[in-house]
Amino acid sequence: MHAIARFSIPLGQASEFRAQLATLQSVLAQAPGFIDGVFGQNLDDPTLWHLSTNWENVGSYRRALSSTRAKLEAIPILARAIDEPGAYE
């Protein structure tokens, strides 16, 4: 299962947001079922960012987001994501 979150972030917030994405990836990486993940800034439009993660199954992804640590550290960052479907087979 692949989860993709895209973000539109003003250029002035880019370095801070990169650090936030690193924290987010670190939080998710500790969850059972996490396989791997990457994040990056779009080359053509530097205000666009993505976080892509791979999971054993959709249940492990959903459980990761419902953990206390995720609610405190990850969800506030994910709340900034562009509102669009992000779960893929």
Could you tell me what each predicted segment is?
Residues 23-36, 54-88:
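An amphipathic, aromatic/His-enriched active-site/gating alpha helix that lines ligand/cofactor pockets
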Residues 2-8, 38-65:
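Short, well-ordered beta-strand segments in beta-rich or mixed alpha/beta enzyme
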Residues 8-19:
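Short, surface-exposed ligand-recognition loops at beta-strand->loop->(often short) alpha-helix junctions
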